[in-house]
């Protein structure tokens, strides 16, 4: 796989994940207690021996830059591997920001063309899955494809959110429709037994959806982006237009895959990691590990706690609390008599000293972490939050959507999201 260049699309402003993207690019959003979203595609690349990786991003790229530079030094040992962020920039030749996924790649085509590779692997930065890209690329080569799409069978409920396609008997894409609705959606229904599904599974999942993951022959991608500047998005324009003109093949991926680009899907995917005995996605795979930055934190300390079906990152301090079906990020601090249930706590970037905590409390300020006697249920608490004593974050009025950013929180799809660094005073009820 040395002749493959991977390009990870960092996405736009991440408005569907706001406020988690308020101060960070979407690929830098924390995941599963200690990782970041970008670790998923980068780890999949490394495990497939793909070591030339660009990450394209447009907004708030400082923390993403820092994470990648501190984590992935692929050139050690005198190799030519790298993981590098390419941020959108205004130039005299191009006075515009990225206009879409394809336009993002087009704006850096001058750099991408310099690499002597056979294929370009286009990936997304906000999916949770484990894939062997070497099998994907080998399928592309074996079929002599110009473009290969990674696809999965899908049910009708979710089908309209994806690009759908029809295939011939050889697996070639003969029709492609991006996020069809109504009659157009029904027209894209196919017999998915051609993908190897049994009749029962095929009846439940009668659509073939694109995962937004592509392999292009080098010259094909350069030609498409150079000669069709009006096409700014891969899924909406480039792929539908190219599907009939080029040998476009489909590669079946029939394992766990989740688009976690919204607050609701992000929350559900994180909490699903706690399911027993078999979570839909596991970070405990020695054959295909997910990498992240080594932080050298101390072990987590639990003092008379009751913890059930939860994931707790390293370096946490928990005192006489109850934690149920939750994910706690690194350096989380939870004081006595707290109840954490169905919650995602992202932890902290640093420790407050004991002296500072006592000083803050003496001065009427709220220390970092979860104060004693507090309850957090069905919520996301971003990093470095200061939650006071006897706080109730339970969405007591069952609100679906609310913007209270000035008070330190928002509600999305019924999930309370406490913003990064927020201060929630003692006795607050949300």
From Swiss-Prot:
Keywords: ATP-binding, Carbohydrate metabolism, Glycogen biosynthesis, Glycogen metabolism, Nucleotide-binding, Nucleotidyltransferase, Transferase. Pathway: Glycan biosynthesis; glycogen biosynthesis. GO terms for biological process: glycogen biosynthetic process. Its EC number is 2.7.7.27. InterPro entries: ADP-Glc_PPase, ADP_Glu_pyroP_CS, GlgC_bac, NTP_transferase_dom, Nucleotide-diphossugar_trans, Trimer_LpxA-like_sf. The keyword 4Fe-4S does not apply. GO terms for cellular component: carboxysome. Alpha-D-glucose 1-phosphate binds at residues 163, 178-179, 210. It is an enzyme of class 2 (transferase). One of its GO terms (molecular function) is glucose-1-phosphate adenylyltransferase activity. It catalyses: alpha-D-glucose 1-phosphate + ATP + H(+) = ADP-alpha-D-glucose + diphosphate. Coiled coil: none annotated. PROSITE patterns: ADP_GLC_PYROPHOSPH_1 (PS00808), ADP_GLC_PYROPHOSPH_2 (PS00809), ADP_GLC_PYROPHOSPH_3 (PS00810). Involved in the biosynthesis of ADP-glucose, a building block required for the elongation reactions to produce glycogen. Catalyzes the reaction between ATP and alpha-D-glucose 1-phosphate (G1P) to produce pyrophosphate and ADP-Glc. HAMAP family: GlgC. Belongs to the bacterial/plant glucose-1-phosphate adenylyltransferase family. Homotetramer. This is Glucose-1-phosphate adenylyltransferase.
């Amino acid at each position: 796989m040395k002749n493959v260049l991977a390009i990870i699309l960092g996405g736009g402003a991440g408005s569907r994940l706001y406020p988690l993207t308020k101060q960070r690019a979407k690929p830098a959003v924390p995941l599963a207690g200690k990782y970041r979203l970008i670790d998923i595609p980068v780890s999949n690349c490394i495990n497939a021996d793909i070591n030339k990786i660009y990450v394209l991003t447009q907004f708030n790229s400082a923390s993403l830059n820092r994470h990648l530079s501190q984590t992935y030094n692929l050139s050690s040992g005198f190799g030519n591997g790298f993981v590098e962020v390419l941020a959108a920039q205004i130039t005299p030749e191009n006075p515009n920001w990225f206009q879409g996924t394809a336009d993002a790649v087009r704006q850096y085509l001058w750099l991408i063309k310099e690499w002597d590779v056979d294929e370009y692997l286009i990936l997304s930065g906000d999916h949770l899955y484990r894939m062997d890209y070497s099998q994907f690329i080998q399928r592309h080569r074996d079929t002599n494809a110009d473009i290969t799409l990674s696809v999965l069978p899908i049910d009708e409920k979710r089908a309209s959110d994806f690009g759908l396609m029809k295939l011939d008997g050889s697996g070639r894409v003969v029709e492609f429709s991006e996020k069809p609705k109504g009659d157009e959606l029904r027209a894209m229904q196919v017999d998915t037994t051609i993908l190897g599904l049994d009749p029962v599974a095929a009846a439940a999942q009668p659509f073939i959806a694109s995962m937004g993951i592509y392999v292009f022959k080098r010259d094909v991608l350069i030609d498409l982006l150079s000669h069709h500047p009006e096409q700014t998005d891969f899924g909406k324009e480039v792929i539908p237009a190219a599907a009939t003109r080029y040998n476009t093949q489909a590669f079946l991926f029939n394992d766990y895959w989740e688009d976690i680009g919204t607050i609701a899907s992000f929350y559900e995917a994180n909490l699903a990691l706690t399911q027993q005995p078999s979570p839909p996605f596991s970070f405990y795979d020695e054959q295909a590990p997910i990498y992240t930055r080594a932080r050298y934190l101390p072990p987590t300390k639990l003092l008379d706690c009751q913890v059930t079906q939860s994931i707790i990152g390293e370096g946490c301090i928990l005192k006489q609390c109850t934690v149920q079906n939750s994910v706690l990020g690194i350096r989380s601090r939870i004081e006595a008599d707290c109840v954490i249930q169905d919650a995602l706590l992202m932890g902290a970037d640093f420790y407050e000293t004991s002296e500072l905590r006592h000083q803050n409390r003496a001065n009427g300020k709220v220390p970092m972490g979860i104060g004693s006697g507090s309850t957090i249920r069905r919520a996301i608490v971003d990093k470095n939050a200061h939650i006071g004593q006897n706080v109730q974050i339970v969405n007591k009025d069952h609100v679906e959507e609310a913007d209270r950013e000035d008070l330190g929180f928002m509600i999305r799809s019924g999930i309370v999201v406490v913003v990064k660094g927020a201060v929630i005073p003692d006795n607050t009820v949300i």
